[in-house]
């Protein structure tokens, strides 16, 4: 029996063939269409995978694909932290943002050891990143007085430490910004009918839109991560229904990937 060839000993961000896994974050406002968009992308190419936001964990519900996954300690203890945050933001914003970032890091790190390890041209699409966790959502809650000075300081310290431990594995090769007006996002919130989000006011979406524009369109938002200033960004107008221009959007993504 012939001895099988030795396989390349790969790092978490490298496929078993030695090809680096491209990591692309899909960013945008609440209900801009990120979940719909990543579902489109994962059907395009077998070398493309997506890591959806772990919303089920935030709502303390096991999603279908996690049917056999062991519950985390936080899930066993109960509590819909997403709903708690929306209902009483001054009390729960710090808890929610910390857990949202933790669960995101856990999901994204786990994905690096998935089926893409055998892919020829692997691309991993994250539904949001640890950077929007901090510089869009947590920052907005602090500026809206939903986090006090002590909580914000602790959150930033914790975020810096988590990134010092795991951030290199999650560094982005590109960002796709799904750009939609706050009014369109509010309409989509009503349509998708997620109970926790039904009380979101337009003003909240407008604040998040402004931050996304500053970070991803005008590139004036400052972060602690210098490399982000040079990360390529593809901006897609998604005010229209994806069904009307799905093929065009996919082609733009392919072209973007060829240059990153």
From Swiss-Prot:
Predominant cellular place of this UniProt entry's protein: nucleus
Catalytic activity reported: 2'-deoxycytidine + a ribonucleoside 5'-triphosphate = dCMP + a ribonucleoside 5'-diphosphate + H(+); 2'-deoxyadenosine + ATP = dAMP + ADP + H(+); 2'-deoxyguanosine + ATP = dGMP + ADP + H(+)
Residues holding ATP: 28-36, 188-192, 240-242
Compartments, record wording: Nucleus
GO terms assigned for molecular function: ATP binding; cytidine kinase activity; deoxyadenosine kinase activity; deoxycytidine kinase activity; deoxyguanosine kinase activity; deoxyribonucleoside binding; magnesium ion binding; protein homodimerization activity
Class in the EC hierarchy, top level: transferase
Active-site positions on this chain: 127 (proton acceptor)
Top-level taxon: Eukaryota
Residues binding substrate: 53, 86, 97, 128, 133, 197
EC number from the UniProt entry: 2.7.1.74, 2.7.1.76, 2.7.1.113
A Gene Ontology cellular-component term: mitochondrion
Classification via Pfam families: dNK (PF01712)
Modifications after synthesis and translation: Phosphorylated and activated in vitro upon phosphorylation at Ser-74 by CSNK1D/CK1.
GO biological process, one term: dAMP salvage
Residues recorded as bearing Phosphothreonine in the entry: 72
Keywords, comma-separated and alphabetical: ATP-binding, Kinase, Nucleotide-binding, Nucleus, Phosphoprotein, Transferase
Annotated positions of the Phosphoserine modification: 11, 15, 74
UniProt record similarity statement: Belongs to the DCK/DGK family.
Assembly with partners or alone: Homodimer.
UniProt function note: Phosphorylates the deoxyribonucleosides deoxycytidine, deoxyguanosine and deoxyadenosine.
Name by which UniProt lists this protein: Deoxycytidine kinase
């Amino acid at each position: 029996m012939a001895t099988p060839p030795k396989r390349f000993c790969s790092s978490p961000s490298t496929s078993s063939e030695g090809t680096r896994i491209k990591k692309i974050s899909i960013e945008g406002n609440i209900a801009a269409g990120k979940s719909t968009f990543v579902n489109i992308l994962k059907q395009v190419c077998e070398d493309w995978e997506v890591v959806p936001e772990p919303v089920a964990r935030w709502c303390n519900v096991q999603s279908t694909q996690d049917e056999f996954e062991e519950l985390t300690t936080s899930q066993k203890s109960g509590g819909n932290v997403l709903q708690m945050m929306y209902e009483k933001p001054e009390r729960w914003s710090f808890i929610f943002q910390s857990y949202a970032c933790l669960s995101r890091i856990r999901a994204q790190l786990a994905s690096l050891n998935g089926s893409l390890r055998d892919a020829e041209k692997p691309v991993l699409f994250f539904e949001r990143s640890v950077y929007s966790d901090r510089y869009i959502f947590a920052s907005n809650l602090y500026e809206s007085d939903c986090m006090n000075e002590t909580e914000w300081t602790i959150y930033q310290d914790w975020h810096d430490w988590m990134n010092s431990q795991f951030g290199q594995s999650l560094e982005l090769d590109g960002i796709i910004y799904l750009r939609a007006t706050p009014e369109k996002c509010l309409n989509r919130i009503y349509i998708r009918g997620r109970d926790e989000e039904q009380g979101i006011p337009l003003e909240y979406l407008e604040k998040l839109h402004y931050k996304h524009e500053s970070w991803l369109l005008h590139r004036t938002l400052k972060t602690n991560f210098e490399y982000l200033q040079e990360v390529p960004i593809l901006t897609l107008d998604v005010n229209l229904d994806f069904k009307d221009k799905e093929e065009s959007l996919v082609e733009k993504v392919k072209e973007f990937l060829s240059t990153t």
